[in-house]
């Protein structure tokens, strides 16, 4: 017997420049959330600084570690999605929302490993595994193919990026893009969907792919914006990430809301349902 297709939420199409609207809405959310949004950026920047401190004399490892760190960014931004959702529902976006996102729903379902309550944890573990794989691959690639040991950022610039002979940097970028593209397609709206709705990991990932297939140019533009702003954040000695990461996190929530009609799926908890009804009626 043929398998029954998995029912997925309806996917919408958007215009090419719609990602710019998501960024504008993200700045509005950052202004309304105040310090709690920027605290996320500060925490992510501090974590990036820790990576830098540990691996600064091993740039062959650092290049992969920093880029791999960005692979798990959709998980780290989970509570930013929750803050934007609270603001959308005309609720307070405060520390309580953040703590509830990271602690309460997991703690109340500790005995339900394997079902949809743990999808966010499982997806985070998969992204972390992908990031680790990229770190190892990148380190091996640079170590084996670089003409001299790459220990500092200047070594990386001189012997990889600006090398006169060979295509090492282009190959490194191509390999990274080849690995990053399916991760982006799998995660572009998956985490906000898992936060908002009671969906399986398979449904979230397939819906994310469906979004990319239905909106190839807007999603390519969105990916380019994410990459560009992230490079600006990294290029400012990580300080720019204090602003960039909250902005991209809030914007990702608005991307999800624009791109997916998830009304066919049940809300993740009753508390959210109550909040949505009160938000709409007020």
Located regions from the model:
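Hydrophobic alpha-helical membrane segments
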Residues: 1-282
